[in-house]
């Protein structure tokens, strides 16, 4: 036969201040639970941390610095530009002026001209940024580079 017992919570209703939790305050807040949330992960809950969350502490990965937040700098080498210059002219994205193919990299969405590769034809390149080697190679081939964004030295002088 099933023994009918009253539940402890019903039995203690209205009887005592602590409802069998011992001293007043033992059942308050989170003192008996080891703290709220992630409290104690490096102290009294360390065994839990190393078992279930081993990567909780320490650094991981690498965030490369950006020139400006949110700006991805797209680049092109002078060798690549020399290869596609005639194609850009045929598509109408570049024009010919004084025997030079004029390419505006800013309009093409390219931010910087770099110096890898060879330049076989004279080019006139308009770009926000360019490396010294890129400028040197284009000028040696009989072209010119117009840098639209001022360098730090130029900005400090003016």
Swiss-Prot record:
GO biological process: translation
UniProt keyword annotation of RNA-binding present: yes
UniProt keyword rRNA-binding present: yes
Annotated InterPro entries: Rbsml_uL15_N (IPR027386), Ribosomal_uL15 (IPR030878), Ribosomal_uL15/eL18 (IPR021131), Ribosomal_uL15/eL18_sf (IPR036227), Ribosomal_uL15_CS (IPR001196)
Keywords assigned by UniProt, alphabetized: Ribonucleoprotein, Ribosomal protein, RNA-binding, rRNA-binding
GO MF annotation, one: rRNA binding
Pfam hit, one: Ribosomal_L27A
Highest taxon of source: Archaea
One cellular component (GO) term of this entry: cytosolic large ribosomal subunit
Family: Belongs to the universal ribosomal protein uL15 family.
Subunit and partners: Part of the 50S ribosomal subunit.
Matching HAMAP family: Ribosomal_uL15
Described function: Binds to the 23S rRNA.
Name of this protein: Large ribosomal subunit protein uL15
Protein's organism: Aeropyrum pernix (strain ATCC 700893 / DSM 11879 / JCM 9820 / NBRC 100138 / K1)
Encoding gene, per UniProt annotation: rpl15
């Amino acid at each position: 036969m099933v023994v009918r017992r009253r539940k402890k919570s019903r039995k203690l209703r209205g009887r005592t201040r602590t409802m069998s939790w011992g001293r007043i305050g033992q059942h308050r807040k989170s003192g008996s639970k080891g703290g709220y949330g992630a409290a104690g992960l490096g102290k009294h809950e360390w065994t839990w941390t190393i078992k279930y969350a081993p990567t909780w502490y320490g650094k991981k990965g690498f965030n490369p610095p950006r020139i400006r937040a949110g700006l991805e700098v797209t680049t092109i080498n002078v060798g690549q530009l020399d290869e596609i210059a005639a194609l850009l002219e045929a598509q109408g994205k570049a024009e010919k002026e004084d025997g030079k193919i004029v390419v505006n990299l800013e309009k093409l969405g390219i931010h910087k001209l770099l110096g890898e590769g060879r330049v076989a034809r004279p080019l006139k390149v308009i770009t926000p940024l360019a490396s010294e080697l890129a400028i040197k190679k284009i000028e040696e081939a009989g072209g010119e580079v117009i840098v639209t964004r001022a360098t730090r030295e130029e900005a400090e002088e003016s």
